[in-house]
Design a protein with these regions (language model features):
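A conserved catalytic-core segment of Leloir-type glycosyltransferases
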Residues: 2-10, 37-117, 264, 278-314
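Conserved donor-binding/catalytic core segment of Leloir-type glycosyltransferases
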Residues: 212-233, 239-242, 254-258
């Protein structure tokens, strides 16, 4: 069966979503791009998520093809600090109320019109709900008219999942071969459907912005790193590599954007203990388009001002949210983007940086797309000496660097959301055939 807008309706379940209240990390962005892409292809899509309590319960977007269903708003009213504030209460309500709504309010009417229902769940929070939806569809005699995928991007919450029940009822997917092998240890053999990046990231970066950023940083070599302050994210080898480069007389600056995690203080103290000068960089006024990704001189001016007032340092600690539009400028201006995580289920930051033509240093876990010295530098260890070696190697081999930059951009083009969704559709079609054969 071909899955087409005329014969299929999508129902997507997640905790995170497109609202600022609902956006806590990469999942919010992933699910927003996924639903938007499906809708842009003509599909009717219903996205059920923990929404902002002060926004409308139901909202139509993408010319009516995408319907947002903001769930648990009555609970979120008492928990203003985002999607995971009051998590357990929201989870209970989600599990109790979403399944009957999906089956009776969305699936049954669509199936009565001869349509297929594709239900997609994201992360451990939706594992129970999607299992209950399957049970209820079966009870109503409708299960054979639905294809159901549940996806995980990480191992968070695995201990709370009833794997036997979930894998019996639902097709399980994940985002990389690395995650597939991890999940085999749990007795699960998932399908692999990669993550994606929006096409807009592939747009050209204004070289005037890039040159201005470079001119504000007094160095011969710019390294950037954007990640949570966490031991697995490779901050320690990153700062120690900077220290070793400095000790050889090389002039390098690390642009560091972490989170609010206390581990950041430990890393910055470590940097200072090996002789690195750390400068905190704050913006003095709010950007005009902070909540959008608008590109313009005025929108970027607060960031340029902040960097111009930072003074000289070996590490510039960026203490402000950075929109994708300005991140692209940082990546493009960087000689190296460090994405050297010990455990990286997919590596979305890596791909976003590669889309700008940056040379990315990846880890060697979930970055299936990374090819050493072809489109990136794939690090084999968590060793600062390896980071230092390849930085020096790039400085000495400019033609090789240019080749990596060109290949990186071409690689990123293969992972735009429209291509990822095509892969998803083919796997849904395959699973639909498997289900139909099982019934005959």
């Amino acid at each position: 069966m071909n899955i087409l807008p005329e014969n299929t309706i999508f129902v997507v379940l997640s905790f995170e979503g497109p609202d600022a209240y609902s956006m806590a990390g990469g999942l919010g962005a992933r699910i927003t791009y996924l639903t938007q892409t499906l809708a842009s292809m003509g599909f009717e899509v219903h996205h059920i998520f923990i929404g902002d309590p002060h926004m409308s319960k139901v909202e139509a977007r993408e010319e009516g093809r995408l319907t947002l269903h903001r769930w648990c708003q009555w609970i979120s009213e008492y928990h203003p600090n985002g999607v995971y504030d009051g998590e357990e209460g929201k989870l209970y309500d989600f599990n109790e109320s979403v399944p009957p709504f999906v089956v009776h309010g969305l699936a049954a009417p669509a199936i009565s019109q001869g349509k297929l229902i594709a239900v997609l769940g994201e992360e451990w929070h939706t594992a129970e709900a999607i299992s209950r939806i399957s049970d209820l569809l079966h009870y109503e005699g409708l299960r054979n008219k639905a294809v159901m995928f549940w996806n995980t991007n990480n191992t968070y919450g695995f201990e709370r999942i009833n794997w036997a029940r979930l894998s019996y009822a639902i097709t399980i997917t994940t985002v990389s071969k690395y995650m597939k092998h991890i999940m085999r240890n749990w007795g699960i053999n998932p399908l692999v459907i990669p993550n994606g990046i929006p096409k807009e990231i592939l747009g050209e970066v204004d070289e005037a912005h890039v040159m201005r950023l470079k001119g504000l940083i007094d160095t011969d070599f710019i390294v950037s790193k954007v990640a949570r302050w966490h031991p697995d994210k490779g901050w320690k080898p990153a700062v120690e590599a900077m220290g070793r480069l400095r000790s050889t007389g090389k002039k390098c600056v690390l642009l560091a954007r972490g989170g609010i995690e206390p581990y950041g203080g430990k890393i910055l103290k470590r940097a200072q203990s090996i002789g690195l000068k750390v400068r905190d960089v704050c913006i003095q006024r709010r950007p005009l388009d902070e909540d959008s990704n608008a590109i313009g001189e005025d929108a970027f001016e607060p960031y340029f001002e902040a960097l111009s007032h930072a003074g000289t340092g070996d590490i510039l600690n960026l203490l402000f949210p950075i929109p994708h539009s300005f991140l692209k400028v940082i990546y493009r201006a960087s000689d190296v983007v460090l994405a050297n995580s010990l455990h990286e289920p997919f590596g979305l930051v890596d791909l976003e940086a590669m889309a700008t033509g940056a040379v990315v240093f990846t880890g060697c876990s979930g970055e299936d797309y990374a090819m050493h010295l072809v489109n990136s530098i794939v690090l084999d260890s968590f060793n600062a000496e390896e980071v230092k070696f390849y930085i020096e190697n790039l400085q000495a081999h400019d033609e090789e660097k240019k080749g990596i930059q060109a290949a990186a951009r071409e690689t990123a083009k293969q992972f735009t959301w429209d291509k990822v969704v095509r892969s998803l559709l083919r796997k849904l079609e395959y699973q639909t055939e498997v289900q139909q054969r099982a019934l005959t």
